[in-house]
Amino acid sequence: MDVAAAALPAFVALWLLYPWPLLGSALGQFSAGGCTFDDGPGACDYHQDLYDDFEWVHVSAQEPHYLPPEMPQGSYMVVDSSNHDPGEKARLQLPTMKENDTHCIDFSYLLYSQKGLNPGTLNILVRVNKGPLANPIWNVTGFTGRDWLRAELAVSTFWPNEYQVIFEAEVSGGRSGYIAIDDIQVLSYPCDKSPHFLRLGDVEVNAGQNATFQCIATGRDAVHNKLWLQRRNGEDIPVAQTKNINHRRFAASFRLQEVTKTDQDLYRCVTQSERGSGVSNFAQLIVREPPRPIAPPQLLGVGPTYLLIQLNANSIIGDGPIILKEVEYRMTSGSWTETHAVNAPTYKLWHLDPDTEYEIRVLLTRPGEGGTGLPGPPLITRTKCAEPMRTPKTLKIAEIQARRIAVDWESLGYNITRCHTFNVTICYHYFRGHNESRADCLDMDPKAPQHVVNHLPPYTNVSLKMILTNPEGRKESEETIIQTDEDVPGPVPVKSLQGTSFENKIFLNWKEPLEPNGIITQYEVSYSSIRSFDPAVPVAGPPQTVSNLWNSTHHVFMHLHPGTTYQFFIRASTVKGFGPATAINVTTNISAPSLPDYEGVDASLNETATTITVLLRPAQAKGAPISAYQIVVEQLHPHRTKREAGAMECYQVPVTYQNALSGGAPYYFAAELPPGNLPEPAPFTVGDNRTYKGFWNPPLAPRKGYNIYFQAMSSVEKETKTQCVRIATKAAATEEPEVIPDPAKQTDRVVKIAGISAGILVFILLLLVVIVIVKKSKLAKKRKDAMGNTRQEMTHMVNAMDRSYADQSTLHAEDPLSLTFMDQHNFSPRLPNDPLVPTAVLDENHSATAESSRLLDVPRYLCEGTESPYQTGQLHPAIRVADLLQHINLMKTSDSYGFKEEYESFFEGQSASWDVAKKDQNRAKNRYGNIIAYDHSRVILQPVEDDPSSDYINANYIDIWLYRDGYQRPSHYIATQGPVHETVYDFWRMVWQEQSACIVMVTNLVEVGRVKCYKYWPDDTEVYGDFKVTCVEMEPLAEYVVRTFTLERRGYNEIREVKQFHFTGWPDHGVPYHATGLLSFIRRVKLSNPPSAGPIVVHCSAGAGRTGCYIVIDIMLDMAEREGVVDIYNCVKALRSRRINMVQTEEQYIFIHDAILEACLCGETAIPVCEFKAAYFDMIRIDSQTNSSHLKDEFQTLNSVTPRLQAEDCSIACLPRNHDKNRFMDMLPPDRCLPFLITIDGESSNYINAALMDSYRQPAAFIVTQYPLPNTVKDFWRLVYDYGCTSIVMLNEVDLSQGCPQYWPEEGMLRYGPIQVECMSCSMDCDVINRIFRICNLTRPQEGYLMVQQFQYLGWASHREVPGSKRSFLKLILQVEKWQEECEEGEGRTIIHCLNGGGRSGMFCAIGIVVEMVKRQNVVDVFHAVKTLRNSKPNMVEAPEQYRFCYDVALEYLESS
């Protein structure tokens, strides 16, 4: 046996090399498919399986073999188990067969081992239609003995299906013995020992139901036969039940429980016994999916008790046909469900409850058990409200007060309101005095226990009724009349108070209060003196009170002091008490002074021929101090009645001697003496030829008689009282000649005094001129030394803005040397024969004095007449920079009335001829027919051959001569329209002809859906006529784009560079909210325009409004810097003489002023990178005198120019429904910067406390927000998704005590409202934790995922204003920048949040802007970066330490680069 086993491999090798094809002649002796193996398996078309583990071996009777002698003799196929590992298999494949009738396959087999061990297993497999191998249909294992055994295969697979029988030998663990087969026969009749199955039919069933296969077999069902249902993939299902049909036929049932689509496959029946096996054909299990609608029902109509729907059952998921349609509906708040069968496309649901939400679904049914599919998507809708059932019951009065009434009513349930949304309104009306009525309706809270009507008038009949209203109707209660209680009365009307003054009494009357609020019972008047013209009157006494009856509305107050102001308080009273008092001040009249009694007293002390000396005694003031004493001389006439001494009618009109002489007056004033000159009796000489207070006291005429009067006068405000007395009489002399005083001598004396004074004044003026010249030379030297210190001057400017400059006089409109703006600002026409040429020409002195001066250092020579080239017209003088803030504030009062008046004074419309522009051949070249080029200033193009009209383009020269460094620049600007399609070639001709290097574009191509400018430049290269324009570089920034072109012309060996500066930050309507971006834009253009270049081409759409704004601002910035003044009004006026309607709106005119003011206040704050380190150290140096630094002053300037938000700016954040979404109500985002949420989340609003911010290069690149509150976490993730944010920067800590929860999943996946957030990874790098999230919107899954990285910064302690490390914070910024460049092609936004969305977040944004600024422009401008952020949100970079930290990080970045 061992020898034979050892020799078997050699035998196998010889067998494999045997020439089997030569034995093909023996095939004819076998039936198809059978084989006796006399000539080997190949002769029977049997094949070894190429993919098994080893081969069957052929044993031939004609060839020697080495099998043990006890093995059968003859030819057969054998497997030696001892040569193979357990589990290895050998397969022998019979040829494929197609039989059309019942047949049988029988064969011989043995399993033998010398020691009686298990040699392995013989399996029979049947493959159908070249499908997969299933489990064996028959097998035998273990030792069977030395003799051959027979077995049968009853295969019930019929044509056209084909099958293949496979014999498989499997080695067992014993590895000993042989497995052999022989004499395989295919018989044309049924098997004798194994039953044959009838054809197995397909089974169709609905998903979720049980499927049953019934296999019917012909033959005897032996007790030991094994039956099962075999699936094509090898799964075996046991038999459920067998049943004998008759003595030769039985049935077997197989059941599959609750089948699904995954159970749909091919199945066959198998029976097995020791004698053989039977196998049926494969039948298909077909699983049908019950139908379900794709779409929900569609609502066609709705009423209070019905819903009309369309089923929408044509598009389904699942299988048809549909044999039944049903509608299933229920209240969304209830649990019961009703189902109605429907046989029409539409269905009306009746008997529903009003204002109730229903969920409606459609059910579809196909044939078969379980054919009803799942309900389709729901239609959730609500019925309309129904009219209220009845009128509310009568109101019950719960409380009556003077100004409020409390009412209540029955509880209003749904059975009354018939609607969940209803209003309870109390309407009331009442009549006031003068037949005035008042009516109003108040919405009440139906759930409140009591309802109060406030703000009612006291002591008034009020009619009330309640109205119950819902969207479908209203019911009103009966009207109830109630009288409110009395209250204290209102004040006595101020206008009704009238006081009539006398010297010692006041008559006061008044009217009843407009709001008596009941029955007036009395009036009370309190009064006291508060001041007096007479110092002797006491004014600090206690107030006195007078009470009047209710019907007495006047009173006379006696025994008062003259010239004294009394304050009266009048108040009325009802039974409820006194109301508020009304005050009035009344002043008693003053009394005339009291003069001493001269009756019987001779006041004459001495008398000469031309004089008389009298004794003057002081008067006694009564109610007002003495203002003056007057001496009146009256000439005696013999026929005039003599005045009596003592009290008399005084002389009120002062008349000088000269006027009396020429006018024939009978008296004249000889002197007026101040009261201080007469503290006690003193002599006075009448006729002493002296002048007193302008009154000449001439010598008296000896031959005339005179009465001498002494007057005392008291005068306060507009009241004057005079008392006079005759104190002496001088009789006429009888002998001396008459001497008449000569007024001419008095005049000569005055002239002499004036001449001496003038000489002294001239000397002083000459001295002042010398001082001014010396001062001026010193000032010029100081200005030259201070050229590099712009920041210090800016700070001084802010600190000194509101001071009055006593040493610098303003420009006066009366100056006879004032000239027009065209004259004084050197606007020069282009053509010498221009009718608008000014005649004034500046001389060398103008040029010499026009040296560059600092922007904020206003030069003294502005006060020196014609020396300044910036004096202006008489009506609108230039404004000093130092006075600009005050001027603008004044002009903005009363709704900017000053600006409105100035702007409306400009000439509107055409002011010069434009015949060329109006020609028919030029009409298509004008964008607007009313804004075209004037003839006298138009740009004349060099004509194209054979086209005389080709010299026209809608453009005008704007001429200005700037004396800067001795260079004159006529035609500094060209103002033109935005090109239309027909003028693109002309536009480039103009740029080439005028040698322009800069194009300024102040419009977008399309605004509000209208084309504003044709795209006249290429993205790459384009040819326009004979011009080739190539775009070589484009630099997009947040508010403007800089494009660099090369310009070539056919026939010219020259390539020019032209830069286009396209300002994109001008809004579609109005003007920019702030001028910061435009000012930066203008500075960039100035720096880029070469000194030798031609005019700057400026255009918007029409070339008037925005173009004019740009040019005026540019001119005025130069003017302010050179001369310290601005003249906006006359500049606009001059520009309008060159092109129609430059600066088109009042809003633009105001914006120009605001822009100039911002430029003057802020100054130039950019520092070149190469100078930054030295400049920064200079900025932080503390000045020993001021104890401050330039950096601190700059931050104070920043605070002063930061706009303050008003309540109306944040109207959306202030809405009541948004209050709980704000962490701090004093840190709200303005409406104009809000990112409104797009994704809907139930009833949540679209508001979030966040603001869009510009970065250096990209508008709205940053979103700054507060740390999410517990109730805004969902909103935060909506914000991230809706605005494509790829970075989240977290600058504060998680702190539940401050309402700062963890808003992200640490691992795995969480859902926040409609947004699903999945944490993909988490890592830590120094002070930064990096988390990557994958988020998607579950309401819009088709949009895919958004990858977001969160940067949680750990290096900033909560109690510190700045981070602990500059380097780590800079690293954070650079990490975020790198991630942003990698994600979404750099287009993703960055969300930055701290506790309040202010200081910390602003600092991150500001440093990010500065880093980009350094990369792009090689400058550092922290002031501009923070100012730009604060224009949107004022709390960006809150503390001075944070502002300095921005500078520190900028320095760190420069030193590390």
Swiss-Prot record:
The modification Phosphoserine is found at S868. Substrate binds at D1068, C1100, S1101, A1102, G1103, A1104, G1105, R1106, Q1144. SMART domains: FN3, IG, MAM, PTPc, PTPc_motif. Residues 899-1159, 1191-1453 form the Tyrosine-protein phosphatase domain. Gene3D superfamilies: 2.60.120.200, Immunoglobulins, Protein tyrosine phosphatase superfamily. It is an enzyme of class 3 (hydrolase). High levels in liver and kidney. Lower levels in lung, brain and heart. Not seen in spleen and testis. The active site is at C1100, C1394. GO terms for cellular component: axon; dendrite; membrane; neuronal cell body; photoreceptor outer segment. The chain crosses the membrane at residues 753-774. The keyword Disulfide bond applies. Residues 195-280 form the Ig-like C2-type domain. It is a single-pass type I membrane protein. Residues 1-25 form the signal peptide. Residues 775-1457 are cytoplasmic. One of its GO terms (molecular function) is protein tyrosine phosphatase activity. Glycans are attached at N100, N139, N210, N415, N423, N435, N461, N551, N585, N589, N606, N689. Disulfide bonds join C215-C269. Residues 30-193 form the MAM domain. Pfam families: fn3, Fn3_PTPRU, I-set, MAM, Y_phosphatase. Residues 26-752 are extracellular. This protein undergoes proteolytic processing. Its main location: membrane. Regulation of processes involving cell contact and adhesion such as growth control, tumor invasion, and metastasis. Negative regulator of EGFR signaling pathway. Forms complexes with beta-catenin and gamma-catenin/plakoglobin. Beta-catenin may be a substrate for the catalytic activity of PTPRK/PTP-kappa. Belongs to the protein-tyrosine phosphatase family. Receptor class 2B subfamily. This is Receptor-type tyrosine-protein phosphatase kappa. The lineage of its organism: Eukaryota, Metazoa, Chordata, Craniata, Vertebrata.
